Amino acid sequence: MAETLTAQAAPVATAPAVTASEKFIFDTQGYLVLENFLKPDHIAKLLAATATTVARRREQTRTGAKQTGFTQVNGKDSTRIFYILDDDPLFLELLDWPAIMPYVHTLLSHMPHHCASDVIVAHASDFPKQVPGWHIDGHDDGFRNLGAPIPLLQLKIGYYLTDMTKPGASHLMVVPGSHKTKQSPGEPGPDGMLPGAVQVCAPAGSAILFHNALWHGIGPFHPGRSRTMLYYAYEHPWMIASQEHWGYTKDFYNSRLSPARQKFFHGFLFDPPQARWG
């Protein structure tokens, strides 16, 4: 079984500069845990927005109605929704949340582009035979064609909206340091685990930042447990690796994005196109 993780957490209240120790942890381990990153009232609002969005998207999926992105309906209660920025203003707000931007700028780029967004609501009753699904992120087979170790091209951020301090709730699992390896981890053991894997245990409101080449998956799902979380991803401005950029309407780009948020997307998406770098 994978061991559990409770260390490497850095409580965050406002938007301080990223510390040398945080950068060191991210560089060596491939991920960084920021406990209690979102405040309780913010979490409550995001959970309410998630519930409303899930109900609407599941109905759109049932009726075949047009929707932004796509929705995976998994059983009676579990849902995963892709392309969520236009589903609720709170989801769009997290795109450039002031407290997270110093981390995105320091760890990835001073001109980050949006790459992906999704919400996960999962209940153990809908996943009786869940497997970890170990993988690395990125197109073209995880950017493996660029050689090993794979460079940092995308920064992924997971926000726990439910308490994940105890293992067994389909936690994010990671293999620390695996983003630097030149070797494949091989096949999982009989229990489905990779060597050195840990479940990332943290309170509701915690943010987990990780490298695109970090091997990760999902942990065991014990009966009666559930998980709600958001994922956001950022990439370099010279990349066109996100199909989500083509998933939103012209009205979204031209009417609902502030000038600052427009800079998270390529200029050619706007009408008229914006002639700019980044």
Residue ranges and their predicted role:
Residues 2-28, 35-143:
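Non-heme Fe(II)-dependent double-stranded beta-helix
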Residues 102-103, 128-201, 240-247:
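Catalytic core of non-heme Fe(II) oxygenases with the double-stranded beta-helix
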Residues 164, 211-214:
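Short Ser/Thr-interspersed hydrophobic loop/turn segments at strand-loop and sheet-helix junctions
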Residues 117-119, 157-159, 230-234:
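A structural signal for short, well-ordered beta-strand segments
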